[in-house]
Amino acid sequence: MEITCPDWTHETAALAEGFTCVVGVDEVGRGPLAGPVTAAAVRLFPGRIPEGLNDSKKLTALRREMLAAEIHTVAEVSIAHASVEEIDRLNILQASHLAMGRALAGLPSRPDFALIDGHMVPKGLGHRCRAIVKGDALCLSIAAASIVAKVARDRIMVDLEQQHPGYGWRTNAGYGTKDHLQALLNLGPTPHHRRSFKPVHNILYQEASISP
């Protein structure tokens, strides 16, 4: 099996087209039952690209932390979120796009081209964009965005676990693991659970149906 690593090909192509501020965008947290969805936008600079960038899911937690710290030092970085309330009101896809737009808007330089992980370009970003399927494994700027977004969201979930112990958010990051689902049954949902997601909705419906 051929092992692929992200490279600078997509950034080079955009720069060759005349764009001058090319950034990578990725999000993390679409699937969890709890917590926000988090997006990051990163502008890397040739000659200052950290070694070992890759899809955040392929890296250990320690390696992600180390790379995130380096990325914040050598690159322009913006991190943004869409809240649980926004996820429930809009749906997870639209909330993810909202977080991406906020991340782009938060960069110190105004991007003129965005490389976005996935198969869909969010509407209304106000930037020229290109969607790249599996971009976090192919494009260095998107890989960097995936790392800082993952680290930022994991820290949020660790903080939330201090407020709501018992759900295992430090380790499961809000995903629907067996232990998390059991805790939902035993403890009930918190304000940080996504009511629009089926496992949480079903538990709330059960609670409502047995209430006097």
UniProtKB/Swiss-Prot annotation:
Endonuclease that specifically degrades the RNA of RNA-DNA hybrids. It is found in: Cytoplasm. It comes from the Bacteria. It comes from Cereibacter sphaeroides (strain ATCC 17029 / ATH 2.4.9) (Rhodobacter sphaeroides). Residues 20-209 form the RNase H type-2 domain. GO terms for biological process: DNA replication, removal of RNA primer; mismatch repair. GO terms for cellular component: cytoplasm; ribonuclease H2 complex. Belongs to the RNase HII family. Its cofactor is Mn(2+); Mg(2+). It catalyses: Endonucleolytic cleavage to 5'-phosphomonoester. Its EC number is 3.1.26.4. It is an enzyme of class 3 (hydrolase). Its main location: cytoplasm. Manganese or magnesium. Binds 1 divalent metal ion per monomer in the absence of substrate. May bind a second metal ion after substrate binding. This is Ribonuclease HII. Keywords: Cytoplasm, Endonuclease, Hydrolase, Manganese, Metal-binding, Nuclease.
